[in-house]
Amino acid sequence: MAYQGIDLLSTKAAGDDHGENSSYFDGWKAYDTNPFDLRHNRGGVIQMGLAENQLSLDLIEEWSKNHPEASICTPEGVSQFKRIANFQDYHGLPEFRKAMAQFMGQVRGGKATFDPDRVVMSGGATGAQETLAFCLANPGEAFLVPTPYYPAFDRDCCWRSGIKLLPIECHSFNDFRLTKEALVSAYDGARRQGISVKGILITNPSNPLGTITDRDTLAMLATFATEHRVHLVCDEIYAGSVFATPEYVSIAEVIERDVPWCNRDLIHVVYSLSKDFGLPGFRVGIIYSYNDAVVAAARRMSSFGLVSSQTQYFLARMLSDEEFIGRFLQESKCRLVARHERFTSGLREVGIGCLRGNAGLFSWMDLRRMLREKTAEAELELWRVIVHQVKLNVSPGTSFHCREPGWFRVCHANMDDETMEVALGRIHDFVRQHQQRRVKAERWAANRQLRLSLPHHHHLSPAHLSSPLALLSPQSPMVRATS
């Protein structure tokens, strides 16, 4: 979009390197202009591009009703209003940092411990990622990221910091698992280009794959980081959204139990309450670094994106309720697995598969056989049909830097059951129509090939052509028998 007066702005503001020109964001625009509503707009676009967990918000609402003292805006909690309304230290409320550290350990099954003094707040995981980018690298330096990866990393990590993200190419033949060979290849390739590699960024569990990184791979990454003196940033915002085996393993557990000799100054964790707790509107992001200098610098930078004291106060009380948190995590897991099963089984009914996942709020859907050809252009062509005709905002794999065309991320935890059934119905209709068109096209091609393969008989008379024997070879025994 062209704006008037853009020539009066800074290069940063007027530039086009914000990362939002991706098809990932284009699908959101289609939804925003025509959003689906069960009662008022059933023909609208269904939002399946938003990784949001709305399945268990009722549990948080119930807790809030039963604990009015957790809010400073109720008669039960108003006595704390003045304290919370006044200026607070950038470190955050001590009770919030303590509760958050406790919660992070509980989410990881008590297999890792977290120090409240290392908890740094940020306005969501977006701010946390950017803060780490500013802390760990200079403009022009790079982080290696396994593909496919979250499209907004290009904005969050690069736009204002000036760093680069370089792909570690992963492939479907091994379910997109990260290997040491792929990591070394990406690292050496960057070095040959004269690019300084400052770190590795992974999402565990993976967005968009919905899979976890296993213990051995995490140990390999920590070892590689130590040997090559590069940072390892683990985005663990879906750590509490693992709903099936294998069990989740955090980098915090690995460096405590498996590679205690690694250089902890190079290890950093990003966390948030947006996904596991379904509270993206609260804008709570966390940096947890084992590096004292990073903690100090990140705290100074946190003044640009603090979490409100009122939010901290409320969450400190809720996260400290270990019994409730335990029940919430268990019930959330049950609801996530039920939704995942319903969606993937619904796809199987029309022959559509997904990468086998056990975490997250989405599925990695395989539509490769529906492509006109195996190209990124064909994938985007199919995606446009899905968004604008089927009216489902799904995200194409190319927007996640996936090199294999035909994969799509589909979010299914951000809607109620009835909307999910409408979405599945649209997918069923679309796939069946596509199958019918393909069958017709194959029949037409076969008939055309048959016609082309038949001999030409321009020299025969119309009377001869009307004979049942007209299309037989003159040397046929049946023709000779009638002559």
UniProtKB/Swiss-Prot annotation:
Factors inducing expression: Down-regulated by partial submergence. Induced in leaves by infection with the fungal pathogen Magnaporthe oryzae. Induced by phosphate deficency.
Regions that span the bilayer: none
Gene3D superfamilies named among the record's database cross-references: Aspartate Aminotransferase, domain 1, Type I PLP-dependent aspartate aminotransferase-like (Major domain)
InterPro entries: Aminotransferase_I/II_large, Ethylene_sulfur-biosynth, NHTrfase_class1_PyrdxlP-BS, PyrdxlP-dep_Trfase, PyrdxlP-dep_Trfase_major, PyrdxlP-dep_Trfase_small
One Pfam family from the record: Aminotran_1_2
Reaction catalysed by this enzyme: S-adenosyl-L-methionine = 1-aminocyclopropane-1-carboxylate + S-methyl-5'-thioadenosine + H(+)
Family statement drawn from the similarity comment of this UniProt entry: Belongs to the class-I pyridoxal-phosphate-dependent aminotransferase family.
Protein name per Swiss-Prot or TrEMBL: 1-aminocyclopropane-1-carboxylate synthase 2
Originating gene: ACS2
